[in-house]
């Protein structure tokens, strides 16, 4: 099973299309850095909302 992942990585590393993706999407790096925080912000927003309505 581990060989499947290694073979997949080997195929993608030799493909010029996949090799250019990070460079092509370098403009969206700041957005990608913030994306993991979005679920935490959603949780905090729900908590603040419930606090605003007195936890009904």
From Swiss-Prot:
GO terms for cellular component: chloroplast thylakoid membrane; photosystem II reaction center. Its main location: plastid. The keyword Transferase does not apply. Residues 1-19 form a propeptide. Keywords: Chloroplast, Membrane, Photosynthesis, Photosystem II, Plastid, Reaction center, Thylakoid, Transmembrane, Transmembrane helix. It is a single-pass membrane protein. It is found in: Plastid, Chloroplast thylakoid membrane. The keyword Chloroplast applies. Belongs to the PsbK family. NCBIfam families: PRK02553.1. PSII is composed of 1 copy each of membrane proteins PsbA, PsbB, PsbC, PsbD, PsbE, PsbF, PsbH, PsbI, PsbJ, PsbK, PsbL, PsbM, PsbT, PsbX, PsbY, PsbZ, Psb30/Ycf12, at least 3 peripheral proteins of the oxygen-evolving complex and a large number of cofactors. It forms dimeric complexes. This is Photosystem II reaction center protein K. It comes from Pinus thunbergii.
């Amino acid at each position: 099973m581990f060989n499947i992942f290694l073979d997949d990585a080997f195929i993608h590393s030799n493909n010029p299309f996949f090799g250019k993706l990070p460079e092509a999407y370098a403009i969206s790096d700041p957005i990608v850095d913030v994306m993991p925080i979005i679920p935490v912000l959603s949780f905090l927003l729900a908590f603040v909302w419930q606090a605003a309505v007195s936890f009904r």
